[in-house]
Design a protein with these regions (language model features):
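Electrostatic cytochrome c docking/interface patches
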Residues: 4-21, 35-38, 88-114
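The canonical Cys-X-X-Cys-His
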Residues: 24-30, 82, 117-126, 183
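Short, solvent-exposed interaction modules
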Residues: 95-136, 144
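Sequence context surrounding c-type heme c attachment/ligation sites in exported
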Residues: 15-22, 47, 51, 111-121, ...
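Axial heme c-ligation environment in periplasmic c-type cytochrome domains
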Residues: 35-41, 56-99, 132-138, 156-190
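The feature marks the first
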Residues: 14, 18-60
Length: 191
């Protein structure tokens, strides 16, 4: 069926997906828990969000240089199965830099209302678990380096697959480098 955004709703088979993720494991880990801080953890991420990212990467709507050509030849069902597999896994937890926790938590929970920046909790939940029905990703436990890179990419207009509302670009424009460092560290330790 088609959802509000016109994307087909994920109808993946996690068991089938397990057999299709071997190549993914080199960067993202066999269970979706990347050991490299610049590659995102996919484990436990919402199926809808994962499927959107896979489709955007495959179509070129989201440029991810290390994934160039990796999804070529994969069917819609393959992508749905891969998304279902990673969504069914448990994300490993990380730790925040204690020196950055207070600032990161203040941004995550309170935003910068004086600058029109809402709290992250509104879309990504107070625990960072996201909202898969709305397509908002889980952030809690994600690698801080990866989160920092994505926030920077949104801020600089390098990443633009946040929809017509440009919500993440508008939010990231209000973040300084110090804000991004604190927020991404806090998110890494959030679970």
């Amino acid at each position: 069926t088609l959802g509000m955004t016109g994307l087909a709703q994920a109808a993946g088979d996690a068991a089938a997906g397990q057999g299709k993720v071997a190549v993914c494991g080199a960067c993202h880990g066999a269970d979706g828990n990347s050991m490299a801080p610049t590659f995102p953890k996919l484990a436990g991420q919402g199926e809808r969000y994962l499927l959107k990212q896979l489709n955007d990467i495959k179509s070129g709507a989201r440029a991810v240089v290390p994934m160039t050509g990796m999804l070529t030849g994969m069917s819609d069902q393959d992508l749905q199965d891969i998304a279902a597999y990673f969504a069914s896994q448990n994300m490993s937890v990380g730790a925040a830099d204690p020196a950055l926790v207070a600032r990161g938590e203040a941004l995550f929970r309170g935003g910068k209302l004086d600058q029109g920046m809402p709290a992250c909790t509104g879309c990504h939940s107070p625990t960072g678990s996201g909202n898969d029905a709305a397509g908002f990703p889980q952030l809690g436990g994600q690698h801080g380096d990866y989160v920092a890179l994505q926030l920077t990419n949104f801020r600089e207009g390098v990443r633009t697959n946040d929809g017509d509302t440009k919500i993440m670009r508008a939010i990231a424009e209000k973040l300084s480098n110090k804000d991004i460092a604190a927020l991404s560290s806090y998110i890494q330790g959030l679970h």
